[in-house]
Protein backbone atom coordinates (compact mmCIF):
# COMPACT_ATOMS: atom_id res chain seq x y z
CA UNK A 1 0.00 0.00 0.00
CA UNK A 2 3.03 2.32 0.45
CA UNK A 3 3.41 2.61 -3.33
CA UNK A 4 -0.19 3.78 -3.69
CA UNK A 5 0.50 6.63 -1.22
CA UNK A 6 3.78 7.65 -2.89
CA UNK A 7 2.46 10.38 -5.20
CA UNK A 8 0.05 11.96 -2.71
CA UNK A 9 0.43 15.20 -0.76
CA UNK A 10 2.15 14.71 2.58
CA UNK A 11 -0.96 15.44 4.65
CA UNK A 12 -2.94 12.84 2.66
CA UNK A 13 -0.08 10.33 2.81
CA UNK A 14 0.27 10.69 6.59
CA UNK A 15 -3.44 10.39 7.35
CA UNK A 16 -4.01 7.65 4.77
CA UNK A 17 -1.20 5.58 6.29
CA UNK A 18 -2.75 5.94 9.75
CA UNK A 19 -6.12 4.72 8.46
CA UNK A 20 -4.55 1.79 6.61
CA UNK A 21 -2.54 0.78 9.68
CA UNK A 22 -5.74 0.90 11.74
CA UNK A 23 -8.22 -0.80 9.40
CA UNK A 24 -6.14 -2.74 6.83
CA UNK A 25 -8.74 -4.17 4.43
CA UNK A 26 -11.66 -4.08 6.88
CA UNK A 27 -14.58 -1.69 6.17
CA UNK A 28 -14.88 1.47 8.27
CA UNK A 29 -17.18 4.49 8.58
CA UNK A 30 -16.44 8.22 8.42
CA UNK A 31 -16.92 8.41 12.19
CA UNK A 32 -14.46 5.56 12.75
CA UNK A 33 -11.91 7.29 10.52
CA UNK A 34 -12.35 10.51 12.54
CA UNK A 35 -11.77 8.59 15.76
CA UNK A 36 -8.67 6.79 14.43
CA UNK A 37 -7.07 10.09 13.41
CA UNK A 38 -7.91 11.77 16.73
CA UNK A 39 -6.29 8.85 18.59
CA UNK A 40 -3.07 9.79 16.77
CA UNK A 41 -3.43 13.42 17.82
CA UNK A 42 -4.63 14.64 14.41
CA UNK A 43 -7.59 16.97 14.07
CA UNK A 44 -10.22 15.35 11.87
CA UNK A 45 -11.96 18.36 10.35
CA UNK A 46 -10.90 17.38 6.80
CA UNK A 47 -11.52 13.62 7.00
CA UNK A 48 -14.28 13.82 4.38
CA UNK A 49 -11.88 15.52 1.94
CA UNK A 50 -9.21 12.91 2.74
CA UNK A 51 -11.56 10.02 1.96
CA UNK A 52 -12.69 11.74 -1.22
CA UNK A 53 -9.07 12.03 -2.45
CA UNK A 54 -8.38 8.38 -1.61
CA UNK A 55 -11.53 7.39 -3.54
CA UNK A 56 -10.47 9.41 -6.59
CA UNK A 57 -7.06 7.70 -6.52
CA UNK A 58 -8.88 4.34 -6.23
CA UNK A 59 -7.00 3.55 -3.01
CA UNK A 60 -10.31 3.04 -1.21
CA UNK A 61 -13.82 2.22 -2.35
CA UNK A 62 -17.09 3.42 -0.84
CA UNK A 63 -20.36 1.53 -0.62
CA UNK A 64 -23.62 1.80 1.26
CA UNK A 65 -23.73 0.54 4.84
CA UNK A 66 -26.22 -2.40 4.77
CA UNK A 67 -27.26 -1.51 8.33
CA UNK A 68 -28.01 2.12 7.46
CA UNK A 69 -28.31 3.05 3.77
CA UNK A 70 -27.81 6.73 4.60
CA UNK A 71 -24.23 5.98 5.64
CA UNK A 72 -21.22 4.79 3.67
CA UNK A 73 -18.61 2.17 4.40
CA UNK A 74 -15.05 2.72 3.16
CA UNK A 75 -12.51 -0.01 2.46
CA UNK A 76 -8.93 -0.09 1.21
CA UNK A 77 -8.46 -1.84 -2.13
CA UNK A 78 -6.08 -4.77 -2.09
CA UNK A 79 -3.02 -4.24 -4.26
CA UNK A 80 -2.19 -6.76 -6.94
CA UNK A 81 0.96 -7.44 -8.89
CA UNK A 82 -0.30 -6.11 -12.19
CA UNK A 83 -0.09 -3.09 -14.49
CA UNK A 84 -2.01 -0.08 -13.21
CA UNK A 85 -4.97 1.58 -14.86
CA UNK A 86 -2.80 4.70 -15.21
CA UNK A 87 -0.29 2.71 -17.28
CA UNK A 88 -3.10 1.45 -19.47
CA UNK A 89 -4.48 4.95 -19.99
CA UNK A 90 -1.00 6.31 -20.75
CA UNK A 91 -0.53 3.73 -23.51
CA UNK A 92 -4.02 4.32 -24.89
CA UNK A 93 -3.48 8.08 -24.95
CA UNK A 94 -0.37 7.51 -27.04
CA UNK A 95 -2.44 5.37 -29.42
CA UNK A 96 -5.23 7.95 -29.51
CA UNK A 97 -2.81 10.73 -30.40
CA UNK A 98 -1.24 8.46 -33.00
CA UNK A 99 -4.46 7.86 -34.95
CA UNK A 100 -6.11 11.25 -34.32
CA UNK A 101 -7.72 11.84 -37.74
CA UNK A 102 -6.20 9.04 -39.81
CA UNK A 103 -8.00 6.00 -38.39
CA UNK A 104 -11.47 5.56 -36.84
CA UNK A 105 -11.23 5.62 -33.02
CA UNK A 106 -13.28 2.41 -32.88
CA UNK A 107 -10.16 0.55 -34.07
CA UNK A 108 -8.69 1.25 -30.62
CA UNK A 109 -11.79 -0.25 -29.00
CA UNK A 110 -11.69 -3.36 -31.17
CA UNK A 111 -7.95 -3.88 -30.61
CA UNK A 112 -8.42 -3.41 -26.85
CA UNK A 113 -11.28 -5.89 -26.85
CA UNK A 114 -9.43 -8.52 -28.86
CA UNK A 115 -6.15 -8.24 -26.93
CA UNK A 116 -7.94 -8.29 -23.55
CA UNK A 117 -10.12 -11.34 -24.28
CA UNK A 118 -7.09 -13.14 -25.73
CA UNK A 119 -5.01 -12.52 -22.59
CA UNK A 120 -7.87 -13.54 -20.29
CA UNK A 121 -8.49 -16.66 -22.36
CA UNK A 122 -4.82 -17.73 -22.30
CA UNK A 123 -4.64 -17.14 -18.53
CA UNK A 124 -7.55 -19.59 -18.15
CA UNK A 125 -5.80 -22.09 -20.44
CA UNK A 126 -2.64 -21.87 -18.30
CA UNK A 127 -4.70 -22.48 -15.17
CA UNK A 128 -6.30 -25.60 -16.64
CA UNK A 129 -2.95 -26.92 -17.91
CA UNK A 130 -1.43 -26.40 -14.43
CA UNK A 131 -4.25 -28.60 -13.08
CA UNK A 132 -3.11 -31.46 -15.31
CA UNK A 133 -5.24 -31.07 -18.44
CA UNK A 134 -3.78 -31.25 -21.94
CA UNK A 135 -3.52 -28.10 -24.06
CA UNK A 136 -6.46 -29.17 -26.24
CA UNK A 137 -8.59 -30.01 -23.21
CA UNK A 138 -7.66 -26.65 -21.68
CA UNK A 139 -8.71 -24.83 -24.87
CA UNK A 140 -12.09 -26.56 -24.88
CA UNK A 141 -12.64 -25.85 -21.17
CA UNK A 142 -11.76 -22.17 -21.71
CA UNK A 143 -14.22 -22.13 -24.63
CA UNK A 144 -16.98 -23.31 -22.33
CA UNK A 145 -16.17 -21.09 -19.34
CA UNK A 146 -15.27 -17.85 -21.19
CA UNK A 147 -15.41 -17.24 -24.95
CA UNK A 148 -14.74 -19.59 -27.86
CA UNK A 149 -11.34 -18.64 -29.29
CA UNK A 150 -10.31 -22.17 -30.29
CA UNK A 151 -11.92 -23.74 -33.35
CA UNK A 152 -12.18 -27.44 -32.53
CA UNK A 153 -12.93 -28.42 -36.14
CA UNK A 154 -9.88 -26.63 -37.50
CA UNK A 155 -7.70 -27.26 -34.46
CA UNK A 156 -6.75 -23.58 -34.65
CA UNK A 157 -6.37 -20.97 -31.91
CA UNK A 158 -7.69 -17.48 -32.72
CA UNK A 159 -5.96 -15.35 -30.09
CA UNK A 160 -4.12 -12.07 -30.60
CA UNK A 161 -0.64 -13.53 -30.06
CA UNK A 162 -1.08 -16.12 -32.79
CA UNK A 163 -2.59 -13.71 -35.30
CA UNK A 164 -0.03 -10.89 -35.02
CA UNK A 165 2.78 -13.31 -35.88
CA UNK A 166 1.59 -13.17 -39.50
CA UNK A 167 3.28 -10.90 -42.02
CA UNK A 168 -0.22 -9.84 -43.07
CA UNK A 169 -1.15 -8.78 -39.53
CA UNK A 170 -4.03 -6.41 -40.27
CA UNK A 171 -5.60 -8.73 -42.84
CA UNK A 172 -5.32 -11.63 -40.37
CA UNK A 173 -6.76 -9.54 -37.53
CA UNK A 174 -9.84 -8.77 -39.61
CA UNK A 175 -10.23 -12.44 -40.55
CA UNK A 176 -9.76 -13.58 -36.94
CA UNK A 177 -12.39 -11.16 -35.63
CA UNK A 178 -14.85 -12.43 -38.23
CA UNK A 179 -14.05 -15.99 -37.17
CA UNK A 180 -14.62 -15.16 -33.49
CA UNK A 181 -17.96 -13.61 -34.45
CA UNK A 182 -18.97 -16.91 -36.07
CA UNK A 183 -17.80 -18.98 -33.10
CA UNK A 184 -19.69 -16.96 -30.45
CA UNK A 185 -23.43 -16.30 -30.65
CA UNK A 186 -23.19 -13.23 -28.40
CA UNK A 187 -20.54 -11.73 -30.73
CA UNK A 188 -22.16 -12.42 -34.08
CA UNK A 189 -22.52 -8.66 -34.69
CA UNK A 190 -18.75 -8.19 -34.44
CA UNK A 191 -18.44 -8.91 -38.17
CA UNK A 192 -20.58 -5.85 -38.87
CA UNK A 193 -18.20 -3.68 -36.86
CA UNK A 194 -15.19 -5.08 -38.72
CA UNK A 195 -16.99 -4.37 -42.00
CA UNK A 196 -17.88 -0.78 -41.03
CA UNK A 197 -14.37 -0.06 -39.77
CA UNK A 198 -12.99 -1.42 -43.03
CA UNK A 199 -9.82 -2.74 -41.39
CA UNK A 200 -8.64 -4.26 -44.63
CA UNK A 201 -9.17 -0.92 -46.35
CA UNK A 202 -6.60 0.65 -44.02
CA UNK A 203 -3.86 -1.37 -45.60
CA UNK A 204 -2.13 1.34 -47.61
CA UNK A 205 1.15 3.21 -47.40
CA UNK A 206 -0.37 6.18 -45.54
CA UNK A 207 -1.91 4.15 -42.70
CA UNK A 208 0.16 0.99 -42.53
CA UNK A 209 2.84 2.42 -40.24
CA UNK A 210 0.13 3.69 -37.85
CA UNK A 211 -1.57 0.31 -37.61
CA UNK A 212 1.75 -1.50 -37.16
CA UNK A 213 2.64 0.88 -34.32
CA UNK A 214 -0.77 0.27 -32.72
CA UNK A 215 -0.15 -3.49 -32.84
CA UNK A 216 3.30 -2.97 -31.26
CA UNK A 217 1.87 -0.93 -28.35
CA UNK A 218 -0.97 -3.39 -27.74
CA UNK A 219 1.54 -6.25 -27.78
CA UNK A 220 3.21 -4.66 -24.75
CA UNK A 221 -0.03 -4.52 -22.75
CA UNK A 222 -0.75 -7.65 -20.72
CA UNK A 223 -4.38 -7.86 -19.59
CA UNK A 224 -4.23 -11.35 -18.09
CA UNK A 225 -4.06 -10.19 -14.45
CA UNK A 226 -5.84 -6.85 -14.77
CA UNK A 227 -9.30 -6.88 -13.22
CA UNK A 228 -12.31 -6.37 -15.45
CA UNK A 229 -13.14 -2.97 -14.00
CA UNK A 230 -9.73 -1.58 -14.99
CA UNK A 231 -10.03 -2.97 -18.52
CA UNK A 232 -13.58 -1.66 -18.78
CA UNK A 233 -12.44 1.74 -17.51
CA UNK A 234 -9.79 1.79 -20.25
CA UNK A 235 -12.53 1.11 -22.82
CA UNK A 236 -14.64 3.90 -21.29
CA UNK A 237 -11.62 6.21 -21.40
CA UNK A 238 -11.31 5.77 -25.18
CA UNK A 239 -15.00 6.61 -25.59
CA UNK A 240 -14.71 9.72 -23.40
CA UNK A 241 -11.44 10.86 -25.01
CA UNK A 242 -13.05 11.03 -28.43
CA UNK A 243 -16.44 12.22 -27.12
CA UNK A 244 -15.97 15.96 -27.89
CA UNK A 245 -15.24 15.17 -31.54
CA UNK A 246 -17.88 12.44 -31.93
CA UNK A 247 -20.62 14.49 -30.23
CA UNK A 248 -20.20 17.09 -32.95
CA UNK A 249 -20.95 14.29 -35.40
CA UNK A 250 -24.17 13.33 -33.61
CA UNK A 251 -23.07 10.61 -31.19
CA UNK A 252 -24.35 10.97 -27.61
CA UNK A 253 -21.98 10.41 -24.69
CA UNK A 254 -23.10 10.73 -21.06
CA UNK A 255 -20.36 11.68 -18.56
CA UNK A 256 -19.88 8.75 -16.20
CA UNK A 257 -20.33 11.03 -13.17
CA UNK A 258 -23.90 11.85 -14.26
CA UNK A 259 -24.57 8.14 -14.71
CA UNK A 260 -23.26 7.37 -11.22
CA UNK A 261 -25.49 10.06 -9.76
CA UNK A 262 -28.61 8.50 -11.30
CA UNK A 263 -27.64 4.95 -10.32
CA UNK A 264 -27.10 6.07 -6.72
CA UNK A 265 -30.43 7.91 -6.68
CA UNK A 266 -32.24 4.81 -7.93
CA UNK A 267 -30.40 2.64 -5.37
CA UNK A 268 -30.79 -0.41 -7.61
CA UNK A 269 -31.30 -3.57 -5.55
CA UNK A 270 -29.84 -7.01 -6.14
CA UNK A 271 -31.71 -9.49 -8.33
CA UNK A 272 -33.14 -6.56 -10.32
CA UNK A 273 -33.72 -6.14 -14.03
CA UNK A 274 -32.63 -2.85 -15.59
CA UNK A 275 -33.47 -1.42 -19.01
CA UNK A 276 -31.79 1.41 -20.91
CA UNK A 277 -33.89 2.06 -24.04
CA UNK A 278 -31.24 4.41 -25.48
CA UNK A 279 -28.17 2.54 -24.28
CA UNK A 280 -25.46 3.90 -26.59
CA UNK A 281 -22.16 2.26 -25.59
CA UNK A 282 -23.70 0.76 -22.44
CA UNK A 283 -22.39 3.06 -19.69
CA UNK A 284 -25.72 3.26 -17.81
CA UNK A 285 -26.03 -0.53 -17.74
CA UNK A 286 -22.43 -1.05 -16.66
CA UNK A 287 -22.68 1.45 -13.78
CA UNK A 288 -25.92 -0.25 -12.68
CA UNK A 289 -24.08 -3.59 -12.69
CA UNK A 290 -21.17 -2.14 -10.71
CA UNK A 291 -23.47 -0.51 -8.17
CA UNK A 292 -25.26 -3.75 -7.36
CA UNK A 293 -22.04 -5.79 -7.21
CA UNK A 294 -20.28 -3.22 -4.98
CA UNK A 295 -23.18 -2.54 -2.62
CA UNK A 296 -25.21 -5.73 -2.49
CA UNK A 297 -23.20 -8.46 -4.16
CA UNK A 298 -26.24 -10.00 -5.86
CA UNK A 299 -27.26 -10.72 -9.41
CA UNK A 300 -28.58 -8.19 -11.92
CA UNK A 301 -29.95 -8.60 -15.44
CA UNK A 302 -29.40 -5.87 -18.01
CA UNK A 303 -31.44 -4.98 -21.08
CA UNK A 304 -30.39 -2.36 -23.59
CA UNK A 305 -31.79 -1.12 -26.88
CA UNK A 306 -29.99 1.16 -29.31
CA UNK A 307 -31.03 2.25 -32.79
CA UNK A 308 -27.43 2.77 -33.95
CA UNK A 309 -26.20 -0.71 -34.83
CA UNK A 310 -22.51 0.08 -34.33
CA UNK A 311 -23.09 1.64 -30.89
CA UNK A 312 -25.10 -1.45 -29.91
CA UNK A 313 -22.13 -3.65 -30.85
CA UNK A 314 -19.77 -1.41 -28.86
CA UNK A 315 -22.11 -1.77 -25.88
CA UNK A 316 -21.79 -5.57 -26.07
CA UNK A 317 -17.99 -5.36 -26.18
CA UNK A 318 -18.09 -2.92 -23.25
CA UNK A 319 -20.19 -5.31 -21.14
CA UNK A 320 -17.88 -8.25 -21.88
CA UNK A 321 -14.78 -6.24 -20.96
CA UNK A 322 -16.42 -5.30 -17.66
CA UNK A 323 -16.82 -8.99 -16.86
CA UNK A 324 -20.58 -9.15 -17.34
CA UNK A 325 -21.59 -12.72 -18.18
CA UNK A 326 -23.36 -13.21 -21.51
CA UNK A 327 -26.37 -14.65 -19.64
CA UNK A 328 -26.74 -11.42 -17.64
CA UNK A 329 -27.46 -9.03 -20.51
CA UNK A 330 -29.34 -8.61 -23.76
CA UNK A 331 -28.69 -5.78 -26.22
CA UNK A 332 -31.28 -5.15 -28.93
CA UNK A 333 -30.94 -3.07 -32.08
CA UNK A 334 -33.88 -0.87 -33.00
CA UNK A 335 -35.85 2.30 -32.36
CA UNK A 336 -37.25 2.06 -28.81
CA UNK A 337 -39.92 4.72 -29.32
CA UNK A 338 -41.44 3.04 -32.37
CA UNK A 339 -40.44 -0.58 -31.85
CA UNK A 340 -39.47 -1.52 -28.28
CA UNK A 341 -38.13 -5.06 -28.06
CA UNK A 342 -39.40 -5.97 -24.60
CA UNK A 343 -42.86 -5.53 -23.13
CA UNK A 344 -44.60 -4.14 -20.09
CA UNK A 345 -43.60 -5.02 -16.54
CA UNK A 346 -40.46 -6.91 -17.52
CA UNK A 347 -37.96 -4.74 -15.62
CA UNK A 348 -37.63 -3.16 -12.20
CA UNK A 349 -35.79 0.00 -13.24
CA UNK A 350 -35.43 2.01 -16.44
CA UNK A 351 -32.54 4.41 -16.83
CA UNK A 352 -31.48 6.55 -19.81
CA UNK A 353 -30.05 9.72 -21.25
CA UNK A 354 -32.02 9.70 -24.52
CA UNK A 355 -31.27 12.19 -27.31
CA UNK A 356 -32.69 15.53 -26.18
CA UNK A 357 -35.48 17.13 -28.23
CA UNK A 358 -35.47 14.34 -30.79
CA UNK A 359 -37.82 15.33 -33.59
CA UNK A 360 -40.12 13.30 -35.81
CA UNK A 361 -42.06 11.32 -33.15
CA UNK A 362 -45.50 12.89 -33.17
CA UNK A 363 -48.90 11.17 -33.13
CA UNK A 364 -48.82 10.15 -36.80
CA UNK A 365 -45.63 8.17 -36.20
CA UNK A 366 -46.32 6.67 -32.77
CA UNK A 367 -49.88 5.46 -33.30
CA UNK A 368 -49.13 3.27 -36.32
CA UNK A 369 -48.34 0.18 -34.20
CA UNK A 370 -51.27 -0.80 -31.87
CA UNK A 371 -48.88 -2.12 -29.20
CA UNK A 372 -46.85 1.09 -29.26
CA UNK A 373 -50.04 3.16 -29.26
CA UNK A 374 -50.90 1.59 -25.90
CA UNK A 375 -47.69 2.96 -24.35
CA UNK A 376 -48.63 6.56 -25.15
CA UNK A 377 -52.17 6.16 -23.83
CA UNK A 378 -51.45 4.42 -20.52
CA UNK A 379 -50.55 7.41 -18.34
CA UNK A 380 -51.94 10.16 -20.54
CA UNK A 381 -54.84 9.67 -22.91
CA UNK A 382 -53.43 10.66 -26.30
CA UNK A 383 -50.03 11.35 -24.75
CA UNK A 384 -48.27 11.97 -28.04
CA UNK A 385 -45.46 14.54 -27.96
CA UNK A 386 -45.05 17.40 -30.44
CA UNK A 387 -43.10 16.66 -33.59
CA UNK A 388 -40.14 18.79 -32.49
CA UNK A 389 -39.38 17.00 -29.19
CA UNK A 390 -39.81 13.40 -28.02
CA UNK A 391 -38.67 14.13 -24.44
CA UNK A 392 -42.00 13.20 -22.82
CA UNK A 393 -42.41 10.19 -25.11
CA UNK A 394 -39.24 8.80 -23.50
CA UNK A 395 -40.65 9.45 -20.02
CA UNK A 396 -43.87 7.55 -20.84
CA UNK A 397 -41.98 4.70 -22.50
CA UNK A 398 -39.72 4.26 -19.48
CA UNK A 399 -42.63 4.43 -17.03
CA UNK A 400 -44.45 1.80 -19.07
CA UNK A 401 -41.63 -0.73 -18.72
CA UNK A 402 -40.65 -0.05 -15.08
CA UNK A 403 -42.10 -1.81 -12.06
CA UNK A 404 -40.32 0.43 -9.58
CA UNK A 405 -38.33 3.52 -10.57
CA UNK A 406 -37.23 5.56 -13.58
CA UNK A 407 -34.10 7.71 -13.84
CA UNK A 408 -33.85 9.93 -16.92
CA UNK A 409 -31.72 12.86 -18.11
CA UNK A 410 -33.61 15.53 -20.06
CA UNK A 411 -33.23 19.01 -21.45
CA UNK A 412 -34.44 21.47 -18.79
CA UNK A 413 -36.93 22.89 -21.31
CA UNK A 414 -39.02 19.74 -20.87
CA UNK A 415 -39.98 21.08 -17.43
CA UNK A 416 -41.83 24.17 -18.63
CA UNK A 417 -42.59 24.05 -22.37
CA UNK A 418 -46.30 24.41 -23.21
CA UNK A 419 -48.66 22.74 -25.66
CA UNK A 420 -48.72 18.95 -25.85
CA UNK A 421 -45.77 18.63 -23.49
CA UNK A 422 -47.64 20.57 -20.80
CA UNK A 423 -50.63 18.25 -21.20
CA UNK A 424 -48.43 15.19 -20.65
CA UNK A 425 -46.53 16.84 -17.80
CA UNK A 426 -49.78 17.74 -16.01
CA UNK A 427 -51.07 14.15 -16.11
CA UNK A 428 -47.76 12.69 -14.92
CA UNK A 429 -47.74 15.19 -12.01
CA UNK A 430 -51.39 14.46 -11.12
CA UNK A 431 -50.70 10.72 -11.11
CA UNK A 432 -48.01 11.49 -8.49
CA UNK A 433 -45.29 9.66 -10.38
CA UNK A 434 -42.50 12.25 -10.12
CA UNK A 435 -40.40 11.89 -6.98
CA UNK A 436 -37.50 14.28 -7.57
CA UNK A 437 -36.10 16.71 -10.13
CA UNK A 438 -32.44 17.76 -10.01
CA UNK A 439 -31.10 20.73 -11.97
CA UNK A 440 -27.55 19.90 -13.04
CA UNK A 441 -24.69 22.39 -13.54
CA UNK A 442 -24.11 23.80 -17.01
CA UNK A 443 -21.27 22.58 -19.25
CA UNK A 444 -21.37 18.95 -18.09
CA UNK A 445 -22.12 17.51 -21.52
CA UNK A 446 -19.86 17.51 -24.57
CA UNK A 447 -22.49 18.49 -27.11
CA UNK A 448 -24.47 21.16 -25.20
CA UNK A 449 -23.49 23.88 -22.74
CA UNK A 450 -27.02 24.20 -21.30
CA UNK A 451 -27.74 22.44 -18.00
CA UNK A 452 -29.69 19.21 -18.12
CA UNK A 453 -31.98 17.82 -15.45
CA UNK A 454 -32.32 14.42 -13.82
CA UNK A 455 -35.86 13.25 -13.13
CA UNK A 456 -36.59 10.37 -10.78
CA UNK A 457 -40.04 8.80 -11.12
CA UNK A 458 -41.36 6.26 -8.63
CA UNK A 459 -44.37 3.98 -9.05
CA UNK A 460 -44.22 3.01 -5.36
CA UNK A 461 -43.68 6.27 -3.48
CA UNK A 462 -43.40 5.87 0.31
CA UNK A 463 -46.38 7.34 2.16
CA UNK A 464 -44.44 10.37 3.41
CA UNK A 465 -43.44 11.32 -0.15
CA UNK A 466 -46.87 11.07 -1.72
CA UNK A 467 -48.35 14.30 -3.06
CA UNK A 468 -44.92 15.94 -3.08
CA UNK A 469 -41.91 16.46 -5.36
CA UNK A 470 -38.37 17.13 -4.17
CA UNK A 471 -36.61 19.87 -6.16
CA UNK A 472 -32.81 20.04 -5.94
CA UNK A 473 -30.91 22.96 -7.46
CA UNK A 474 -27.43 21.51 -7.98
CA UNK A 475 -26.41 24.15 -10.52
CA UNK A 476 -23.39 25.13 -8.39
CA UNK A 477 -22.37 21.55 -7.53
CA UNK A 478 -19.40 21.02 -9.83
CA UNK A 479 -15.64 21.08 -10.21
CA UNK A 480 -13.64 22.03 -13.28
CA UNK A 481 -13.08 19.16 -15.69
CA UNK A 482 -9.45 17.99 -15.36
CA UNK A 483 -8.99 17.28 -19.07
CA UNK A 484 -11.43 19.46 -21.04
CA UNK A 485 -10.98 23.10 -20.02
CA UNK A 486 -14.35 24.35 -21.22
CA UNK A 487 -16.28 21.70 -19.26
CA UNK A 488 -17.35 21.12 -15.68
CA UNK A 489 -17.98 17.79 -14.00
CA UNK A 490 -19.72 16.42 -10.93
CA UNK A 491 -17.21 15.62 -8.19
CA UNK A 492 -17.75 12.79 -5.73
CA UNK A 493 -18.61 15.30 -2.99
CA UNK A 494 -21.24 16.84 -5.28
CA UNK A 495 -22.79 13.45 -6.03
CA UNK A 496 -22.79 12.49 -2.34
CA UNK A 497 -24.46 15.78 -1.37
CA UNK A 498 -27.28 15.35 -3.91
CA UNK A 499 -27.87 11.69 -3.00
CA UNK A 500 -27.87 12.42 0.74
CA UNK A 501 -30.52 15.13 0.36
CA UNK A 502 -32.65 12.85 -1.82
CA UNK A 503 -32.41 9.98 0.66
CA UNK A 504 -33.11 12.21 3.67
CA UNK A 505 -35.89 14.04 1.77
CA UNK A 506 -35.01 17.37 3.32
CA UNK A 507 -35.20 21.12 2.73
CA UNK A 508 -31.91 23.01 2.58
CA UNK A 509 -32.10 26.72 1.90
CA UNK A 510 -30.90 27.51 -1.61
CA UNK A 511 -30.35 23.84 -2.47
CA UNK A 512 -33.41 21.64 -1.98
CA UNK A 513 -37.10 21.93 -1.23
CA UNK A 514 -40.01 19.49 -0.88
CA UNK A 515 -42.99 21.00 -2.74
CA UNK A 516 -46.66 20.01 -2.42
CA UNK A 517 -48.52 19.27 -5.65
CA UNK A 518 -50.95 22.07 -4.81
CA UNK A 519 -48.19 24.65 -5.27
CA UNK A 520 -47.29 23.05 -8.60
CA UNK A 521 -50.91 23.32 -9.72
CA UNK A 522 -50.88 27.03 -8.82
CA UNK A 523 -47.78 27.39 -11.00
CA UNK A 524 -49.66 25.81 -13.92
CA UNK A 525 -47.53 22.62 -13.83
CA UNK A 526 -44.30 24.50 -14.46
CA UNK A 527 -41.57 22.26 -13.02
CA UNK A 528 -38.65 24.63 -13.59
CA UNK A 529 -36.38 23.95 -10.61
CA UNK A 530 -35.37 27.62 -10.23
CA UNK A 531 -39.03 28.47 -9.63
CA UNK A 532 -38.99 26.46 -6.40
CA UNK A 533 -35.42 26.69 -5.14
CA UNK A 534 -32.73 29.19 -6.08
CA UNK A 535 -29.10 29.19 -4.88
CA UNK A 536 -28.53 31.60 -2.02
CA UNK A 537 -25.62 33.95 -2.38
CA UNK A 538 -23.20 33.45 0.47
CA UNK A 539 -23.61 36.24 2.98
CA UNK A 540 -20.42 37.47 4.54
CA UNK A 541 -20.76 37.79 8.30
CA UNK A 542 -19.30 41.16 9.23
CA UNK A 543 -18.04 41.76 12.76
CA UNK A 544 -18.45 45.55 13.01
CA UNK A 545 -16.43 45.85 16.22
CA UNK A 546 -13.55 43.89 14.71
CA UNK A 547 -13.75 45.88 11.46
CA UNK A 548 -13.64 49.15 13.44
CA UNK A 549 -10.57 48.03 15.40
CA UNK A 550 -8.81 47.03 12.17
CA UNK A 551 -9.71 50.38 10.60
CA UNK A 552 -8.28 52.23 13.64
CA UNK A 553 -5.10 50.17 13.42
CA UNK A 554 -4.70 51.00 9.71
CA UNK A 555 -5.33 54.68 10.46
CA UNK A 556 -2.73 54.60 13.25
CA UNK A 557 -0.10 53.03 10.96
CA UNK A 558 -0.87 55.55 8.21
CA UNK A 559 -0.36 58.40 10.73
CA UNK A 560 2.95 56.91 11.87
CA UNK A 561 4.17 56.69 8.27
CA UNK A 562 2.95 60.23 7.54
CA UNK A 563 4.70 61.58 10.67
CA UNK A 564 7.88 59.81 9.62
CA UNK A 565 7.73 61.32 6.11
CA UNK A 566 7.03 64.82 7.48
CA UNK A 567 9.96 64.48 9.89
CA UNK A 568 12.19 63.33 7.06
CA UNK A 569 11.21 66.31 4.84
CA UNK A 570 11.62 68.79 7.72
CA UNK A 571 15.10 67.37 8.36
CA UNK A 572 16.06 67.99 4.73
CA UNK A 573 14.73 71.55 4.90
CA UNK A 574 16.69 72.29 8.11
CA UNK A 575 19.89 70.91 6.61
CA UNK A 576 19.54 73.14 3.57
CA UNK A 577 18.93 76.37 5.49
Curated annotation (Swiss-Prot):
It catalyses: a 2'-deoxyadenosine in DNA + S-adenosyl-L-methionine = an N(6)-methyl-2'-deoxyadenosine in DNA + S-adenosyl-L-homocysteine + H(+). Pfam families: N6_Mtase (PF02384). Disulfide bonds: none annotated. S-adenosyl-L-methionine binds at residues 251-256, 281-283, 306, 335-336. One of its GO terms (biological process) is methylation. The keyword Transferase applies. It is an enzyme of class 2 (transferase). The subtype gamma methyltransferase (M) subunit of a type I restriction enzyme. In the presence of the R subunit the complex can also act as an endonuclease, binding to the same target sequence but cutting the DNA some distance from this site. Whether the DNA is cut or modified depends on the methylation state of the target sequence. When the target site is unmodified, the DNA is cut. The type I restriction/modification system is composed of three polypeptides R, M and S. Belongs to the N4/N6-methyltransferase family. This is Type I restriction enzyme MjaVII methylase subunit. It comes from Methanocaldococcus jannaschii (strain ATCC 43067 / DSM 2661 / JAL-1 / JCM 10045 / NBRC 100440) (Methanococcus jannaschii).
